[in-house]
């Protein structure tokens, strides 16, 4: 299993683990992204997904270039789309 991490708009990455040690709770993910979550399935062999703020573009959150590159490389978003705000990448099985 790959590590779980946050990608911040400034490009920094931080490894994270679920508070309960097993699965990420909804409230935990909402706190990290700053609002309601949107789950973006990544098309990779590691069964990962990207969690972002569902309303991030409406809130004018900062563009997250690193997360956008990952989402584009996985063909998880359209070419004209982009990611804003904090992005969390976790194993899909750790979504509660």
Where are these predicted regions, by residue range?
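Detector for the mature cores of small, proteolytically processed
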Residues: 1-32, 36-96
């Amino acid at each position: 299993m790959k590590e779980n991490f946050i990608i911040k708009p400034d490009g920094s990455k931080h490894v994270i683990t679920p508070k309960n040690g097993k699965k990420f709770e909804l409230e935990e993910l909402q706190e990290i992204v700053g609002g309601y979550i949107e789950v973006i399935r990544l098309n990779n062999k590691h069964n990962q997904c990207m969690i972002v703020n569902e309303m991030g573009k409406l809130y004018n959150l900062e563009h997250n270039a690193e997360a956008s590159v990952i989402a584009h490389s996985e063909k998880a978003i359209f070419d004209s789309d982009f990611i804003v705000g904090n992005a969390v990448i976790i194993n899909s099985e750790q979504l509660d």
